[in-house]
Amino acid sequence: MYIAGVMSGTSLDGIDVALVRIEGSGVESKVELIHFTTVPFCNDIKSEIQQALSIENSNVQLICSLNFKLGLCFANAVKEVCKEANFSLEQLDLIGSHGQTIYHQPKQDGNRIPSTLQIGEPAVIAYETNTTVISNFRTMDMAAGGQGAPLVPYSEVILYRDPSKNRLLQNIGGISNVTVIPNQQSDQNVIAFDTGPGNMIIDEVCQRLFQLPYDQNGEIAKQGRVVNEILTYCMSHQFLKMNPPKSTGREQFGEKFVSELLKRFEKHSKENILTTVTMFTANSIVHHYKKFILPYYEIDEVILGGGGSYNSTLVEMLRNGLKDENCAIFIQEDIGYSSEAKEAIAFAILANETHHCNPSNVPSATGAKQSVVLGNITFPPV
Protein backbone atom coordinates (compact mmCIF):
# COMPACT_ATOMS: atom_id res chain seq x y z
CA MET A 1 0.00 0.00 0.00
CA TYR A 2 1.05 3.58 -0.66
CA ILE A 3 0.30 5.78 2.34
CA ALA A 4 0.94 9.45 3.15
CA GLY A 5 1.62 10.14 6.82
CA VAL A 6 0.86 13.74 7.79
CA MET A 7 2.12 15.35 10.99
CA SER A 8 1.85 18.87 12.37
CA GLY A 9 3.56 18.95 15.74
CA THR A 10 3.84 21.21 18.76
CA SER A 11 6.82 23.08 17.26
CA LEU A 12 4.59 24.59 14.52
CA ASP A 13 7.46 24.27 12.01
CA GLY A 14 5.04 23.28 9.27
CA ILE A 15 3.38 20.17 7.88
CA ASP A 16 5.58 17.08 7.66
CA VAL A 17 4.48 14.57 5.01
CA ALA A 18 6.03 11.16 4.40
CA LEU A 19 5.09 9.16 1.30
CA VAL A 20 5.59 5.55 2.34
CA ARG A 21 5.20 2.10 0.79
CA ILE A 22 4.15 -0.56 3.31
CA GLU A 23 3.84 -4.29 2.72
CA GLY A 24 1.96 -6.37 5.28
CA SER A 25 1.07 -5.30 8.80
CA GLY A 26 2.12 -5.72 12.41
CA VAL A 27 5.69 -6.70 13.27
CA GLU A 28 6.09 -8.23 9.80
CA SER A 29 5.53 -4.84 8.10
CA LYS A 30 8.08 -3.81 5.49
CA VAL A 31 8.30 -0.02 5.38
CA GLU A 32 9.98 2.02 2.63
CA LEU A 33 10.18 5.83 2.64
CA ILE A 34 9.65 7.07 -0.91
CA HIS A 35 9.79 10.81 -0.24
CA PHE A 36 9.52 13.29 2.61
CA THR A 37 8.83 17.00 2.60
CA THR A 38 7.93 19.78 5.01
CA VAL A 39 5.44 22.39 3.85
CA PRO A 40 5.81 25.55 5.96
CA PHE A 41 2.71 27.22 7.35
CA CYS A 42 1.97 30.61 5.85
CA ASN A 43 2.21 33.38 8.45
CA ASP A 44 -1.58 33.86 8.65
CA ILE A 45 -2.26 30.18 9.39
CA LYS A 46 0.57 29.95 11.91
CA SER A 47 -0.75 33.05 13.67
CA GLU A 48 -4.26 31.55 13.84
CA ILE A 49 -2.89 28.29 15.27
CA GLN A 50 -0.98 30.22 17.93
CA GLN A 51 -4.13 32.16 18.81
CA ALA A 52 -6.18 28.94 18.97
CA LEU A 53 -3.62 27.42 21.35
CA SER A 54 -4.01 30.30 23.79
CA ILE A 55 -6.79 29.83 26.35
CA GLU A 56 -6.96 33.61 26.83
CA ASN A 57 -7.16 34.51 23.11
CA SER A 58 -8.92 31.55 21.50
CA ASN A 59 -12.61 31.24 20.66
CA VAL A 60 -14.89 28.55 19.23
CA GLN A 61 -15.47 30.41 15.95
CA LEU A 62 -11.71 30.54 15.33
CA ILE A 63 -11.23 26.84 16.08
CA CYS A 64 -14.23 25.87 13.93
CA SER A 65 -12.91 27.79 10.92
CA LEU A 66 -9.29 26.73 11.48
CA ASN A 67 -10.35 23.07 11.51
CA PHE A 68 -11.43 23.38 7.86
CA LYS A 69 -8.52 25.62 6.83
CA LEU A 70 -6.03 23.11 8.18
CA GLY A 71 -7.84 20.28 6.41
CA LEU A 72 -7.18 22.13 3.17
CA CYS A 73 -3.55 22.79 4.16
CA PHE A 74 -3.01 19.10 4.92
CA ALA A 75 -4.60 18.07 1.61
CA ASN A 76 -2.33 20.47 -0.28
CA ALA A 77 0.69 19.11 1.59
CA VAL A 78 -0.20 15.58 0.46
CA LYS A 79 -0.48 16.82 -3.12
CA GLU A 80 2.92 18.50 -2.74
CA VAL A 81 4.73 15.37 -1.53
CA CYS A 82 3.26 13.42 -4.46
CA LYS A 83 4.30 16.13 -6.91
CA GLU A 84 7.87 16.24 -5.57
CA ALA A 85 8.10 12.45 -5.76
CA ASN A 86 6.65 12.38 -9.30
CA PHE A 87 4.00 10.09 -7.85
CA SER A 88 0.41 10.05 -9.09
CA LEU A 89 -2.09 11.07 -6.41
CA GLU A 90 -4.50 8.50 -7.88
CA GLN A 91 -2.09 5.73 -6.76
CA LEU A 92 -2.31 6.78 -3.12
CA ASP A 93 -4.25 4.23 -1.05
CA LEU A 94 -4.50 5.94 2.31
CA ILE A 95 -3.68 9.09 4.29
CA GLY A 96 -2.85 9.00 8.00
CA SER A 97 -3.34 12.49 9.44
CA HIS A 98 -2.42 13.28 13.03
CA GLY A 99 -3.90 16.78 12.91
CA GLN A 100 -2.87 19.86 14.86
CA THR A 101 -3.18 19.48 18.62
CA ILE A 102 -5.16 22.36 20.09
CA TYR A 103 -5.43 21.05 23.63
CA HIS A 104 -4.34 17.89 25.41
CA GLN A 105 -5.45 17.10 28.95
CA PRO A 106 -4.13 13.66 29.90
CA LYS A 107 -5.44 13.63 33.48
CA GLN A 108 -8.56 14.72 35.35
CA ASP A 109 -8.52 18.33 36.52
CA GLY A 110 -11.50 19.10 38.74
CA ASN A 111 -14.61 18.47 36.67
CA ARG A 112 -12.59 18.41 33.43
CA ILE A 113 -12.11 14.79 32.39
CA PRO A 114 -9.11 13.53 30.36
CA SER A 115 -9.52 14.70 26.78
CA THR A 116 -7.70 15.78 23.66
CA LEU A 117 -8.46 17.79 20.51
CA GLN A 118 -6.66 17.61 17.18
CA ILE A 119 -8.05 19.59 14.24
CA GLY A 120 -7.59 19.48 10.46
CA GLU A 121 -10.91 18.27 9.07
CA PRO A 122 -10.46 14.78 7.56
CA ALA A 123 -13.53 15.19 5.31
CA VAL A 124 -11.81 18.10 3.58
CA ILE A 125 -8.62 16.06 3.13
CA ALA A 126 -10.59 13.08 1.76
CA TYR A 127 -12.58 15.25 -0.63
CA GLU A 128 -9.61 17.23 -1.93
CA THR A 129 -7.40 14.15 -2.47
CA ASN A 130 -10.14 11.61 -3.26
CA THR A 131 -8.39 9.30 -0.79
CA THR A 132 -9.49 7.51 2.39
CA VAL A 133 -8.24 9.33 5.50
CA ILE A 134 -7.55 7.91 8.94
CA SER A 135 -7.35 10.56 11.64
CA ASN A 136 -8.04 11.27 15.31
CA PHE A 137 -5.63 8.59 16.50
CA ARG A 138 -5.45 9.60 20.15
CA THR A 139 -9.08 9.49 21.23
CA MET A 140 -9.70 5.71 21.36
CA ASP A 141 -6.65 5.22 23.58
CA MET A 142 -8.05 7.88 25.93
CA ALA A 143 -11.48 6.26 25.83
CA ALA A 144 -9.72 3.09 27.02
CA GLY A 145 -8.24 4.95 29.99
CA GLY A 146 -4.92 5.92 28.40
CA GLN A 147 -3.32 9.34 28.06
CA GLY A 148 -3.50 9.29 24.26
CA ALA A 149 0.28 9.63 24.13
CA PRO A 150 2.86 8.67 23.19
CA LEU A 151 1.62 6.88 20.06
CA VAL A 152 4.89 6.43 18.16
CA PRO A 153 6.15 3.41 20.19
CA TYR A 154 4.22 0.93 18.01
CA SER A 155 5.95 2.14 14.85
CA GLU A 156 9.30 2.31 16.62
CA VAL A 157 9.11 -1.36 17.56
CA ILE A 158 8.42 -2.22 13.90
CA LEU A 159 11.29 -0.07 12.61
CA TYR A 160 13.98 -0.28 15.28
CA ARG A 161 13.75 -3.51 17.29
CA ASP A 162 17.16 -5.19 17.17
CA PRO A 163 18.01 -8.89 17.57
CA SER A 164 20.50 -8.25 20.38
CA LYS A 165 20.62 -4.56 21.37
CA ASN A 166 18.39 -2.74 23.85
CA ARG A 167 17.60 0.67 22.40
CA LEU A 168 16.18 3.98 23.54
CA LEU A 169 14.40 5.99 20.85
CA GLN A 170 14.46 9.62 21.98
CA ASN A 171 12.34 12.03 19.98
CA ILE A 172 13.06 15.74 20.51
CA GLY A 173 10.25 17.68 18.88
CA GLY A 174 8.35 20.45 20.61
CA ILE A 175 7.99 17.94 23.44
CA SER A 176 10.49 15.14 24.09
CA ASN A 177 9.45 11.52 24.43
CA VAL A 178 11.36 8.27 24.87
CA THR A 179 10.58 4.68 23.90
CA VAL A 180 12.43 1.78 25.49
CA ILE A 181 12.75 -1.06 22.96
CA PRO A 182 14.17 -4.28 24.43
CA ASN A 183 15.93 -6.64 22.02
CA GLN A 184 14.04 -9.40 20.24
CA GLN A 185 15.16 -12.03 22.75
CA SER A 186 14.01 -10.04 25.79
CA ASP A 187 10.78 -10.59 27.70
CA GLN A 188 10.83 -7.03 29.10
CA ASN A 189 8.00 -4.67 28.14
CA VAL A 190 8.22 -1.82 25.69
CA ILE A 191 7.64 1.36 27.71
CA ALA A 192 7.37 4.95 26.58
CA PHE A 193 6.55 8.35 28.03
CA ASP A 194 7.12 12.06 27.57
CA THR A 195 10.28 13.36 29.23
CA GLY A 196 9.30 17.04 29.16
CA PRO A 197 10.23 19.91 26.86
CA GLY A 198 12.08 19.40 23.61
CA ASN A 199 12.45 22.45 21.38
CA MET A 200 9.36 24.21 22.72
CA ILE A 201 10.99 26.37 25.40
CA ILE A 202 14.18 26.88 23.36
CA ASP A 203 12.20 28.11 20.34
CA GLU A 204 9.95 30.38 22.42
CA VAL A 205 12.97 32.00 24.11
CA CYS A 206 14.65 32.43 20.70
CA GLN A 207 11.59 34.13 19.28
CA ARG A 208 11.16 36.50 22.22
CA LEU A 209 14.79 37.40 22.96
CA PHE A 210 16.48 37.07 19.56
CA GLN A 211 13.58 37.47 17.10
CA LEU A 212 14.64 34.18 15.52
CA PRO A 213 12.38 31.15 14.94
CA TYR A 214 14.91 28.76 16.53
CA ASP A 215 18.55 28.39 17.56
CA GLN A 216 20.08 26.94 14.40
CA ASN A 217 22.50 24.14 15.29
CA GLY A 218 22.56 25.47 18.87
CA GLU A 219 24.98 28.23 17.86
CA ILE A 220 23.60 30.85 20.28
CA ALA A 221 23.37 28.43 23.21
CA LYS A 222 27.01 27.55 22.59
CA GLN A 223 27.98 31.15 23.42
CA GLY A 224 26.36 31.38 26.86
CA ARG A 225 26.76 29.61 30.18
CA VAL A 226 24.36 27.69 32.37
CA VAL A 227 22.83 29.72 35.23
CA ASN A 228 22.30 27.33 38.12
CA GLU A 229 19.41 29.21 39.73
CA ILE A 230 17.46 29.13 36.46
CA LEU A 231 18.24 25.46 35.91
CA THR A 232 17.19 24.59 39.47
CA TYR A 233 13.92 26.45 38.96
CA CYS A 234 13.22 24.57 35.73
CA MET A 235 14.16 21.17 37.15
CA SER A 236 11.74 21.68 40.07
CA HIS A 237 8.77 21.49 37.66
CA GLN A 238 6.08 19.13 38.92
CA PHE A 239 6.07 17.09 35.70
CA LEU A 240 9.56 15.77 36.41
CA LYS A 241 8.36 14.33 39.73
CA MET A 242 5.52 12.30 38.19
CA ASN A 243 5.86 8.58 37.48
CA PRO A 244 5.26 7.18 33.97
CA PRO A 245 3.13 6.66 32.02
CA LYS A 246 2.77 10.38 31.52
CA SER A 247 2.44 12.95 28.78
CA THR A 248 2.75 16.71 28.58
CA GLY A 249 2.49 19.58 26.13
CA ARG A 250 2.21 23.29 25.53
CA GLU A 251 -0.12 23.56 28.52
CA GLN A 252 2.86 22.92 30.86
CA PHE A 253 5.87 24.14 28.83
CA GLY A 254 4.48 26.75 26.45
CA GLU A 255 4.11 30.52 26.47
CA LYS A 256 2.93 30.75 30.08
CA PHE A 257 5.97 28.86 31.38
CA VAL A 258 8.37 31.01 29.33
CA SER A 259 6.67 34.27 30.36
CA GLU A 260 7.08 33.40 34.04
CA LEU A 261 10.69 32.32 33.52
CA LEU A 262 11.70 35.50 31.66
CA LYS A 263 9.97 37.71 34.22
CA ARG A 264 11.62 35.93 37.14
CA PHE A 265 15.14 35.91 35.66
CA GLU A 266 15.18 39.09 33.54
CA LYS A 267 18.50 40.25 35.08
CA HIS A 268 20.41 37.50 33.26
CA SER A 269 21.81 37.84 29.75
CA LYS A 270 19.66 36.47 26.95
CA GLU A 271 22.49 34.17 25.81
CA ASN A 272 22.75 32.63 29.28
CA ILE A 273 18.98 32.16 29.48
CA LEU A 274 18.96 30.31 26.15
CA THR A 275 21.92 28.15 27.16
CA THR A 276 20.19 27.26 30.42
CA VAL A 277 16.84 26.28 28.89
CA THR A 278 18.76 24.16 26.37
CA MET A 279 20.44 22.44 29.30
CA PHE A 280 17.00 22.02 30.88
CA THR A 281 15.84 19.96 27.90
CA ALA A 282 18.99 17.81 28.12
CA ASN A 283 18.83 17.41 31.91
CA SER A 284 15.13 16.54 31.92
CA ILE A 285 15.85 13.71 29.46
CA VAL A 286 18.83 12.43 31.47
CA HIS A 287 16.83 12.71 34.72
CA HIS A 288 14.12 10.42 33.36
CA TYR A 289 16.65 7.89 32.06
CA LYS A 290 18.43 7.65 35.41
CA LYS A 291 15.25 7.48 37.48
CA PHE A 292 12.90 5.36 35.38
CA ILE A 293 14.90 3.42 32.77
CA LEU A 294 18.55 2.68 33.57
CA PRO A 295 17.87 0.97 36.93
CA TYR A 296 15.70 -1.60 35.10
CA TYR A 297 17.09 -1.92 31.55
CA GLU A 298 20.63 -2.37 30.24
CA ILE A 299 20.73 0.10 27.37
CA ASP A 300 23.15 -0.37 24.46
CA GLU A 301 22.13 2.50 22.18
CA VAL A 302 20.31 5.82 22.34
CA ILE A 303 18.96 6.99 18.98
CA LEU A 304 17.94 10.65 18.77
CA GLY A 305 15.29 11.95 16.39
CA GLY A 306 13.21 15.05 15.77
CA GLY A 307 14.38 18.59 15.10
CA GLY A 308 16.29 18.76 18.38
CA SER A 309 18.74 16.14 17.14
CA TYR A 310 20.11 18.81 14.77
CA ASN A 311 20.96 21.10 17.71
CA SER A 312 24.60 20.12 18.27
CA THR A 313 24.81 22.01 21.58
CA LEU A 314 21.83 20.10 22.94
CA VAL A 315 23.23 16.78 21.69
CA GLU A 316 26.59 17.50 23.32
CA MET A 317 24.85 18.30 26.61
CA LEU A 318 23.07 14.93 26.37
CA ARG A 319 26.34 13.12 25.66
CA ASN A 320 27.92 14.72 28.73
CA GLY A 321 24.95 13.80 30.88
CA LEU A 322 25.16 10.15 29.82
CA LYS A 323 28.94 9.76 29.57
CA ASP A 324 29.08 7.33 32.51
CA GLU A 325 26.26 5.09 31.28
CA ASN A 326 28.19 3.05 28.69
CA CYS A 327 25.69 3.50 25.87
CA ALA A 328 26.35 4.74 22.34
CA ILE A 329 24.43 7.83 21.17
CA PHE A 330 23.38 8.21 17.53
CA ILE A 331 21.04 10.38 15.50
CA GLN A 332 18.59 8.85 13.03
CA GLU A 333 20.81 9.63 10.05
CA ASP A 334 23.65 7.58 11.58
CA ILE A 335 21.56 4.43 11.15
CA GLY A 336 20.01 5.26 7.78
CA TYR A 337 16.78 6.96 8.84
CA SER A 338 15.54 10.57 8.85
CA SER A 339 15.09 12.57 12.06
CA GLU A 340 12.64 14.90 10.34
CA ALA A 341 10.49 12.17 8.78
CA LYS A 342 10.21 9.92 11.83
CA GLU A 343 6.81 11.01 13.17
CA ALA A 344 5.16 11.36 9.75
CA ILE A 345 6.28 7.79 8.96
CA ALA A 346 4.83 6.70 12.31
CA PHE A 347 1.35 7.93 11.40
CA ALA A 348 1.54 6.22 8.01
CA ILE A 349 2.27 2.98 9.89
CA LEU A 350 -0.58 3.60 12.35
CA ALA A 351 -2.96 4.25 9.44
CA ASN A 352 -1.90 0.95 7.88
CA GLU A 353 -2.60 -0.89 11.14
CA THR A 354 -6.07 0.68 11.41
CA HIS A 355 -6.77 -0.28 7.80
CA HIS A 356 -5.98 -3.89 8.78
CA CYS A 357 -8.10 -3.57 11.98
CA ASN A 358 -5.04 -4.13 14.17
CA PRO A 359 -4.68 -2.50 17.62
CA SER A 360 -1.70 -0.14 17.61
CA ASN A 361 -1.54 1.62 20.95
CA VAL A 362 0.98 0.34 23.52
CA PRO A 363 -0.86 0.18 26.88
CA SER A 364 2.41 -0.02 28.84
CA ALA A 365 3.25 3.38 27.32
CA THR A 366 -0.09 5.19 27.42
CA GLY A 367 -1.68 3.59 30.48
CA ALA A 368 -4.70 2.31 28.54
CA LYS A 369 -6.65 -0.62 29.97
CA GLN A 370 -6.27 -2.59 26.74
CA SER A 371 -4.95 -2.58 23.19
CA VAL A 372 -7.33 -0.81 20.80
CA VAL A 373 -7.67 0.00 17.11
CA LEU A 374 -6.85 3.70 16.72
CA GLY A 375 -8.38 6.40 14.57
CA ASN A 376 -11.50 7.39 12.65
CA ILE A 377 -11.93 6.45 8.99
CA THR A 378 -13.25 9.03 6.51
CA PHE A 379 -14.01 7.79 3.01
CA PRO A 380 -13.72 9.98 -0.10
CA PRO A 381 -16.81 10.88 -2.14
CA VAL A 382 -18.09 8.03 -4.30
UniProtKB/Swiss-Prot annotation:
<comment type="pathway">
    <text>Cell wall biogenesis; peptidoglycan recycling.</text>
</comment>
<keyword id="KW-0547">Nucleotide-binding</keyword>
<comment type="function">
    <text>Catalyzes the specific phosphorylation of 1,6-anhydro-N-acetylmuramic acid (anhMurNAc) with the simultaneous cleavage of the 1,6-anhydro ring, generating MurNAc-6-P. Is required for the utilization of anhMurNAc either imported from the medium or derived from its own cell wall murein, and thus plays a role in cell wall recycling.</text>
</comment>
<dbReference type="InterPro" id="IPR043129">
    <property type="entry name" value="ATPase_NBD"/>
</dbReference>
<dbReference type="GO" id="GO:0006040">
    <property type="term" value="P:amino sugar metabolic process"/>
</dbReference>
<dbReference type="GO" id="GO:0016301">
    <property type="term" value="F:kinase activity"/>
</dbReference>
<dbReference type="GO" id="GO:0016773">
    <property type="term" value="F:phosphotransferase activity, alcohol group as acceptor"/>
</dbReference>
<keyword id="KW-0119">Carbohydrate metabolism</keyword>
<keyword id="KW-0418">Kinase</keyword>
<feature type="binding site">
    <location>
        <begin position="9"/>
        <end position="16"/>
    </location>
    <ligand>
        <name>ATP</name>
    </ligand>
</feature>
<keyword id="KW-0808">Transferase</keyword>
<protein>
    <recommendedName>
        <fullName>Anhydro-N-acetylmuramic acid kinase</fullName>
        <ecNumber>2.7.1.170</ecNumber>
    </recommendedName>
</protein>
<dbReference type="GO" id="GO:0005524">
    <property type="term" value="F:ATP binding"/>
</dbReference>
<comment type="similarity">
    <text>Belongs to the anhydro-N-acetylmuramic acid kinase family.</text>
</comment>
<dbReference type="InterPro" id="IPR005338">
    <property type="entry name" value="Anhydro_N_Ac-Mur_kinase"/>
</dbReference>
<dbReference type="GO" id="GO:0097175">
    <property type="term" value="P:1,6-anhydro-N-acetyl-beta-muramic acid catabolic process"/>
</dbReference>
<keyword id="KW-0067">ATP-binding</keyword>
<comment type="pathway">
    <text>Amino-sugar metabolism; 1,6-anhydro-N-acetylmuramate degradation.</text>
</comment>
<dbReference type="GO" id="GO:0009254">
    <property type="term" value="P:peptidoglycan turnover"/>
</dbReference>
<dbReference type="Pfam" id="PF03702">
    <property type="entry name" value="AnmK"/>
</dbReference>
